[in-house]
Protein backbone atom coordinates (compact mmCIF):
# COMPACT_ATOMS: atom_id res chain seq x y z
CA UNK A 1 0.00 0.00 0.00
CA UNK A 2 2.81 2.41 0.86
CA UNK A 3 4.56 1.82 -2.48
CA UNK A 4 1.24 2.03 -4.35
CA UNK A 5 0.59 5.48 -2.91
CA UNK A 6 3.37 6.90 -5.13
CA UNK A 7 1.85 5.97 -8.53
CA UNK A 8 -1.57 6.90 -7.14
CA UNK A 9 -0.20 10.36 -6.38
CA UNK A 10 1.18 10.50 -9.92
CA UNK A 11 -2.24 9.69 -11.37
CA UNK A 12 -3.71 12.55 -9.33
CA UNK A 13 -1.14 15.05 -10.56
CA UNK A 14 -1.73 13.91 -14.15
CA UNK A 15 -5.52 14.35 -13.74
CA UNK A 16 -6.15 10.71 -14.61
CA UNK A 17 -9.23 10.48 -12.42
CA UNK A 18 -10.77 7.49 -14.22
CA UNK A 19 -7.66 5.34 -13.80
CA UNK A 20 -7.26 6.46 -10.19
CA UNK A 21 -10.89 5.67 -9.39
CA UNK A 22 -10.80 2.38 -11.30
CA UNK A 23 -7.79 1.08 -9.38
CA UNK A 24 -9.26 2.03 -6.01
CA UNK A 25 -12.69 0.64 -6.83
CA UNK A 26 -11.09 -2.63 -7.97
CA UNK A 27 -9.18 -2.73 -4.68
CA UNK A 28 -12.38 -2.35 -2.67
CA UNK A 29 -14.34 -4.87 -4.74
CA UNK A 30 -11.60 -7.50 -4.42
CA UNK A 31 -11.33 -6.93 -0.68
CA UNK A 32 -15.09 -7.15 -0.15
CA UNK A 33 -15.40 -10.08 -2.54
CA UNK A 34 -12.82 -12.22 -0.75
CA UNK A 35 -14.33 -11.36 2.63
CA UNK A 36 -17.72 -12.47 1.36
CA UNK A 37 -16.19 -15.65 -0.01
CA UNK A 38 -14.28 -16.59 3.14
CA UNK A 39 -16.60 -15.31 5.87
CA UNK A 40 -19.94 -15.15 4.09
CA UNK A 41 -19.76 -18.39 2.11
CA UNK A 42 -17.05 -20.76 3.39
CA UNK A 43 -17.41 -20.12 7.12
CA UNK A 44 -21.20 -20.75 7.39
CA UNK A 45 -20.95 -23.74 5.07
CA UNK A 46 -18.20 -25.42 7.10
CA UNK A 47 -19.85 -24.59 10.44
CA UNK A 48 -23.09 -26.21 9.24
CA UNK A 49 -21.20 -29.42 8.50
CA UNK A 50 -21.15 -28.99 4.74
CA UNK A 51 -18.34 -28.43 2.30
CA UNK A 52 -17.19 -28.79 -1.30
CA UNK A 53 -14.01 -28.58 -3.33
CA UNK A 54 -13.83 -24.80 -2.80
CA UNK A 55 -13.83 -25.05 0.98
CA UNK A 56 -11.54 -28.07 0.89
CA UNK A 57 -9.03 -26.25 -1.31
CA UNK A 58 -9.15 -22.63 -0.18
CA UNK A 59 -10.52 -22.56 3.36
CA UNK A 60 -8.97 -23.57 6.69
CA UNK A 61 -11.29 -23.16 9.71
CA UNK A 62 -8.27 -22.60 11.94
CA UNK A 63 -7.45 -19.33 10.20
CA UNK A 64 -10.71 -17.74 11.38
CA UNK A 65 -10.79 -13.94 11.15
CA UNK A 66 -7.30 -14.09 9.69
CA UNK A 67 -9.03 -14.27 6.33
CA UNK A 68 -9.86 -10.58 6.71
CA UNK A 69 -6.13 -9.85 6.57
CA UNK A 70 -5.61 -12.33 3.74
CA UNK A 71 -8.35 -10.57 1.74
CA UNK A 72 -6.66 -7.25 2.42
CA UNK A 73 -3.29 -8.63 1.27
CA UNK A 74 -4.76 -10.03 -1.96
CA UNK A 75 -6.49 -6.72 -2.73
CA UNK A 76 -3.30 -4.76 -2.05
CA UNK A 77 -1.20 -7.03 -4.27
CA UNK A 78 -3.68 -6.65 -7.14
CA UNK A 79 -3.69 -2.87 -6.69
CA UNK A 80 0.11 -2.86 -6.79
CA UNK A 81 0.13 -4.88 -10.02
CA UNK A 82 -2.47 -2.60 -11.63
CA UNK A 83 -0.29 0.40 -10.78
CA UNK A 84 2.96 -1.20 -11.95
CA UNK A 85 2.81 0.34 -15.48
CA UNK A 86 2.38 3.81 -13.97
CA UNK A 87 5.21 3.12 -11.55
CA UNK A 88 7.63 1.95 -14.22
CA UNK A 89 6.79 4.67 -16.74
CA UNK A 90 9.57 7.24 -16.87
CA UNK A 91 11.52 5.50 -14.12
CA UNK A 92 14.98 7.06 -13.76
CA UNK A 93 17.98 6.78 -11.47
CA UNK A 94 17.46 7.99 -7.89
CA UNK A 95 18.06 11.72 -7.51
CA UNK A 96 19.63 11.91 -4.08
CA UNK A 97 19.67 15.69 -4.19
CA UNK A 98 15.88 15.60 -3.81
CA UNK A 99 16.00 13.45 -0.70
CA UNK A 100 16.72 16.18 1.85
CA UNK A 101 14.03 18.67 0.70
CA UNK A 102 11.54 15.79 0.39
CA UNK A 103 12.20 14.68 3.96
CA UNK A 104 12.07 18.23 5.32
CA UNK A 105 8.70 18.69 3.64
CA UNK A 106 7.16 15.32 4.40
CA UNK A 107 8.35 14.33 7.89
CA UNK A 108 6.20 17.00 9.60
CA UNK A 109 3.24 15.70 7.58
CA UNK A 110 4.00 12.23 8.93
CA UNK A 111 3.66 13.51 12.48
CA UNK A 112 0.55 15.43 11.45
CA UNK A 113 -0.94 12.19 10.15
CA UNK A 114 -0.10 10.32 13.36
CA UNK A 115 -1.65 13.08 15.46
CA UNK A 116 -4.68 13.05 13.16
CA UNK A 117 -5.09 9.31 13.73
CA UNK A 118 -4.92 9.96 17.46
CA UNK A 119 -7.68 12.56 17.12
CA UNK A 120 -9.74 10.05 15.17
CA UNK A 121 -9.38 7.04 17.47
CA UNK A 122 -8.33 8.25 20.92
CA UNK A 123 -11.85 9.02 22.13
CA UNK A 124 -12.90 5.38 21.73
CA UNK A 125 -9.81 4.16 23.57
CA UNK A 126 -10.49 6.60 26.42
CA UNK A 127 -14.16 5.66 26.64
CA UNK A 128 -13.31 2.06 27.37
CA UNK A 129 -10.47 2.75 29.79
CA UNK A 130 -12.14 5.56 31.77
CA UNK A 131 -15.65 4.11 31.99
CA UNK A 132 -14.63 0.54 32.84
CA UNK A 133 -13.82 1.22 36.54
CA UNK A 134 -16.93 3.43 36.90
CA UNK A 135 -19.66 1.54 35.04
CA UNK A 136 -18.22 -1.96 34.79
CA UNK A 137 -17.19 -3.82 31.66
CA UNK A 138 -20.62 -4.41 30.12
CA UNK A 139 -21.87 -0.82 30.49
CA UNK A 140 -18.55 0.61 29.34
CA UNK A 141 -18.61 -1.58 26.24
CA UNK A 142 -22.23 -0.59 25.61
CA UNK A 143 -21.33 3.12 25.62
CA UNK A 144 -18.40 2.38 23.34
CA UNK A 145 -20.71 0.47 20.99
CA UNK A 146 -23.27 3.28 20.96
CA UNK A 147 -20.66 5.90 20.19
CA UNK A 148 -18.90 3.82 17.55
CA UNK A 149 -22.16 2.95 15.78
CA UNK A 150 -23.45 6.53 15.72
CA UNK A 151 -20.04 7.85 14.72
CA UNK A 152 -20.36 5.87 11.50
CA UNK A 153 -23.28 8.06 10.40
CA UNK A 154 -20.97 11.07 10.36
CA UNK A 155 -18.69 9.27 7.91
CA UNK A 156 -20.95 10.55 5.11
CA UNK A 157 -19.19 13.90 5.36
CA UNK A 158 -15.80 12.28 5.96
CA UNK A 159 -16.08 10.39 2.66
CA UNK A 160 -17.02 13.57 0.83
CA UNK A 161 -14.00 15.34 2.32
CA UNK A 162 -11.71 12.51 1.25
CA UNK A 163 -13.06 12.56 -2.29
CA UNK A 164 -12.61 16.33 -2.41
CA UNK A 165 -9.01 16.12 -1.19
CA UNK A 166 -8.10 13.57 -3.85
CA UNK A 167 -9.11 16.02 -6.57
CA UNK A 168 -8.43 19.38 -4.94
CA UNK A 169 -4.88 19.06 -3.64
CA UNK A 170 -3.23 18.44 -7.05
CA UNK A 171 -5.38 21.26 -8.43
CA UNK A 172 -4.26 23.66 -5.69
CA UNK A 173 -0.61 22.94 -6.44
CA UNK A 174 -1.08 23.30 -10.19
CA UNK A 175 -2.79 26.69 -9.77
CA UNK A 176 -0.46 28.11 -7.10
CA UNK A 177 1.52 30.34 -9.49
CA UNK A 178 -1.46 31.41 -11.58
CA UNK A 179 -2.89 34.90 -11.27
CA UNK A 180 -6.02 34.96 -9.10
CA UNK A 181 -5.27 31.57 -7.53
CA UNK A 182 -6.08 32.76 -4.00
CA UNK A 183 -9.45 34.11 -5.08
CA UNK A 184 -10.12 30.76 -6.77
CA UNK A 185 -9.23 28.90 -3.56
CA UNK A 186 -11.69 31.10 -1.69
CA UNK A 187 -14.49 30.33 -4.14
CA UNK A 188 -13.77 26.61 -3.90
CA UNK A 189 -14.01 26.83 -0.12
CA UNK A 190 -17.41 28.53 -0.34
CA UNK A 191 -18.88 25.88 -2.62
CA UNK A 192 -17.24 23.16 -0.55
CA UNK A 193 -18.97 24.39 2.61
CA UNK A 194 -22.24 24.75 0.70
CA UNK A 195 -22.17 21.04 -0.12
CA UNK A 196 -21.12 19.96 3.39
CA UNK A 197 -23.72 22.11 5.14
CA UNK A 198 -26.40 20.78 2.80
CA UNK A 199 -25.28 17.23 3.56
CA UNK A 200 -25.48 17.95 7.28
CA UNK A 201 -29.05 19.18 6.88
CA UNK A 202 -30.08 16.26 4.66
CA UNK A 203 -28.71 13.61 7.03
CA UNK A 204 -30.28 15.20 10.10
CA UNK A 205 -33.68 15.78 8.48
CA UNK A 206 -33.82 12.12 7.50
CA UNK A 207 -32.01 10.65 10.49
CA UNK A 208 -35.01 8.36 11.03
CA UNK A 209 -33.99 6.66 7.78
CA UNK A 210 -30.23 6.79 8.26
CA UNK A 211 -30.51 5.23 11.70
CA UNK A 212 -31.37 1.90 10.07
CA UNK A 213 -27.73 1.66 9.02
CA UNK A 214 -27.23 0.86 12.72
CA UNK A 215 -28.67 -2.67 12.99
CA UNK A 216 -28.77 -2.72 16.81
CA UNK A 217 -31.75 -0.61 17.84
CA UNK A 218 -30.37 -0.29 21.37
CA UNK A 219 -27.66 1.94 19.94
CA UNK A 220 -30.19 4.44 18.58
CA UNK A 221 -30.15 6.08 21.99
CA UNK A 222 -26.90 7.73 20.91
CA UNK A 223 -28.27 9.43 17.79
CA UNK A 224 -28.02 12.75 19.59
CA UNK A 225 -24.27 12.76 18.95
CA UNK A 226 -24.71 12.61 15.17
CA UNK A 227 -25.32 16.36 14.57
CA UNK A 228 -22.36 17.18 16.81
CA UNK A 229 -20.07 14.83 14.90
CA UNK A 230 -21.37 15.96 11.51
CA UNK A 231 -20.65 19.57 12.41
CA UNK A 232 -17.24 18.53 13.74
CA UNK A 233 -16.44 16.93 10.40
CA UNK A 234 -17.53 20.08 8.56
CA UNK A 235 -14.95 22.00 10.60
CA UNK A 236 -12.39 19.29 9.83
CA UNK A 237 -13.15 19.62 6.13
CA UNK A 238 -12.67 23.39 6.31
CA UNK A 239 -9.37 22.82 8.11
CA UNK A 240 -8.19 20.42 5.40
CA UNK A 241 -9.19 22.94 2.75
CA UNK A 242 -7.27 25.67 4.56
CA UNK A 243 -4.18 23.46 4.82
CA UNK A 244 -3.21 24.62 1.34
CA UNK A 245 -1.38 27.55 2.97
CA UNK A 246 1.27 25.54 4.81
CA UNK A 247 1.68 23.05 1.97
CA UNK A 248 2.21 25.68 -0.71
CA UNK A 249 4.58 27.71 1.48
CA UNK A 250 6.47 24.55 2.53
CA UNK A 251 5.81 25.31 6.19
CA UNK A 252 4.57 21.81 6.89
CA UNK A 253 5.88 21.96 10.46
CA UNK A 254 2.82 24.11 11.16
CA UNK A 255 0.65 21.23 9.97
CA UNK A 256 2.29 18.94 12.50
CA UNK A 257 1.91 21.55 15.23
CA UNK A 258 -1.78 22.08 14.49
CA UNK A 259 -2.48 18.35 14.52
CA UNK A 260 -0.60 17.86 17.79
CA UNK A 261 -2.47 20.84 19.26
CA UNK A 262 -5.75 19.17 18.30
CA UNK A 263 -4.64 15.84 19.74
CA UNK A 264 -3.86 17.50 23.07
CA UNK A 265 -7.34 19.06 23.15
CA UNK A 266 -8.88 15.67 22.43
CA UNK A 267 -6.80 14.02 25.14
CA UNK A 268 -7.49 16.59 27.86
CA UNK A 269 -11.22 17.01 27.22
CA UNK A 270 -11.83 13.28 27.07
CA UNK A 271 -9.86 12.59 30.25
CA UNK A 272 -11.66 15.33 32.18
CA UNK A 273 -15.25 14.87 31.00
CA UNK A 274 -15.72 11.22 29.98
CA UNK A 275 -16.07 10.00 33.59
CA UNK A 276 -19.05 12.33 34.06
CA UNK A 277 -20.67 12.62 30.63
CA UNK A 278 -19.64 9.42 28.82
CA UNK A 279 -19.72 9.37 25.03
CA UNK A 280 -21.34 12.82 24.86
CA UNK A 281 -18.04 14.21 26.14
CA UNK A 282 -16.21 12.49 23.30
CA UNK A 283 -18.54 13.99 20.71
CA UNK A 284 -18.16 17.53 22.07
CA UNK A 285 -14.40 17.06 22.42
CA UNK A 286 -14.23 16.16 18.73
CA UNK A 287 -16.21 19.27 17.79
CA UNK A 288 -14.08 21.57 19.97
CA UNK A 289 -10.87 19.99 18.70
CA UNK A 290 -11.66 20.43 15.00
CA UNK A 291 -13.14 23.91 15.51
CA UNK A 292 -9.99 25.01 17.36
CA UNK A 293 -7.71 23.62 14.65
CA UNK A 294 -9.80 25.35 11.99
CA UNK A 295 -9.70 28.75 13.70
CA UNK A 296 -5.98 28.60 14.53
CA UNK A 297 -5.12 27.47 11.00
CA UNK A 298 -7.14 30.36 9.58
CA UNK A 299 -5.23 33.00 11.53
CA UNK A 300 -1.86 31.42 10.77
CA UNK A 301 -2.81 31.24 7.11
CA UNK A 302 -3.69 34.94 7.09
CA UNK A 303 -0.12 35.67 8.16
CA UNK A 304 1.79 33.38 5.80
CA UNK A 305 -0.52 32.87 2.81
CA UNK A 306 -3.63 35.06 3.03
CA UNK A 307 -6.61 33.72 1.10
CA UNK A 308 -9.70 35.97 0.93
CA UNK A 309 -12.20 33.41 2.20
CA UNK A 310 -15.82 34.55 2.12
CA UNK A 311 -16.37 34.16 5.84
CA UNK A 312 -19.80 35.77 5.81
CA UNK A 313 -21.18 33.37 3.23
CA UNK A 314 -19.50 30.37 4.82
CA UNK A 315 -20.86 31.25 8.25
CA UNK A 316 -24.31 31.98 6.81
CA UNK A 317 -24.61 28.60 5.10
CA UNK A 318 -23.50 26.66 8.17
CA UNK A 319 -25.73 28.79 10.40
CA UNK A 320 -28.81 28.45 8.20
CA UNK A 321 -28.36 24.68 7.91
CA UNK A 322 -28.08 24.39 11.70
CA UNK A 323 -31.03 26.76 12.21
CA UNK A 324 -33.29 24.84 9.85
CA UNK A 325 -32.44 21.60 11.62
CA UNK A 326 -33.14 23.24 14.99
CA UNK A 327 -36.51 24.43 13.67
CA UNK A 328 -37.52 20.87 12.78
CA UNK A 329 -36.73 19.83 16.36
CA UNK A 330 -38.76 22.66 17.86
CA UNK A 331 -41.71 21.92 15.57
CA UNK A 332 -41.30 18.18 16.21
CA UNK A 333 -41.72 17.50 12.51
CA UNK A 334 -40.46 13.93 12.79
CA UNK A 335 -43.66 13.04 14.66
CA UNK A 336 -45.98 14.59 12.07
CA UNK A 337 -47.91 12.45 9.61
CA UNK A 338 -46.16 13.90 6.57
CA UNK A 339 -42.88 14.69 8.30
CA UNK A 340 -40.68 13.27 5.54
CA UNK A 341 -42.43 15.42 2.94
CA UNK A 342 -42.33 18.53 5.13
CA UNK A 343 -38.59 18.09 5.50
CA UNK A 344 -38.29 18.62 1.75
CA UNK A 345 -39.54 22.16 2.32
CA UNK A 346 -36.64 22.80 4.68
CA UNK A 347 -34.17 21.38 2.16
CA UNK A 348 -35.73 23.57 -0.51
CA UNK A 349 -35.41 26.59 1.78
CA UNK A 350 -31.70 25.89 2.19
CA UNK A 351 -31.29 25.45 -1.56
CA UNK A 352 -33.07 28.75 -2.32
CA UNK A 353 -31.10 30.63 0.34
CA UNK A 354 -27.83 29.22 -0.98
CA UNK A 355 -28.76 30.00 -4.56
CA UNK A 356 -29.24 33.69 -3.78
CA UNK A 357 -26.15 33.72 -1.58
CA UNK A 358 -23.91 32.19 -4.25
CA UNK A 359 -25.16 34.26 -7.19
CA UNK A 360 -22.32 36.84 -7.04
CA UNK A 361 -19.79 34.01 -7.40
CA UNK A 362 -21.20 33.13 -10.81
CA UNK A 363 -20.70 36.55 -12.37
Set out the residue ranges of the language-model regions.
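Membrane-interface junctions at transmembrane-helix termini in multi-pass inner-membrane proteins
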Residues: 1-24, 87, 230-261, 303
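Membrane-interface "helix-start" segments
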Residues: 19, 96-108, 285-347
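Residue-level signature of transmembrane alpha-helical cores of multipass secondary-active transporters
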Residues: 20, 24, 68-72, 101, ...
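Hydrophobic alpha-helical transmembrane segments
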Residues: 21-88, 261-266, 279-300, 342-350
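Interhelical loop/hinge segments that connect adjacent transmembrane helices in multipass membrane
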Residues: 45-71, 78-120, 167, 171-183, ...
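Transmembrane alpha-helical segments of multi-pass transport proteins
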Residues: 53, 57-65, 116, 262-265, ...
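Interfacial/gating helices of multi-pass transporter permease domains
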Residues: 61-65, 101-105, 109, 127-155, ...
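Specific pore-lining/lateral-gate transmembrane helices of multi-pass inner-membrane transport
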Residues: 146-260
Amino acid sequence: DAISSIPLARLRTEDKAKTFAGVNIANVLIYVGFNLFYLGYCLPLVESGGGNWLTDTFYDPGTGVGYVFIANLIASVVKFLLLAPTMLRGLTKPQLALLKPMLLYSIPLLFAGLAGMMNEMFDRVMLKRLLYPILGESNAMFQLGVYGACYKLSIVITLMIQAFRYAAEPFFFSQAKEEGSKELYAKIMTYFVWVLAGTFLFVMLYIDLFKYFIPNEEYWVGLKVVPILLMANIFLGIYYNQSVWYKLTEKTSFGAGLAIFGALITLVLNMVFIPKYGYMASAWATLICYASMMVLSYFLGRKYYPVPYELGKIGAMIGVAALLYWATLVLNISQMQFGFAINLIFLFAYAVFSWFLLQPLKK
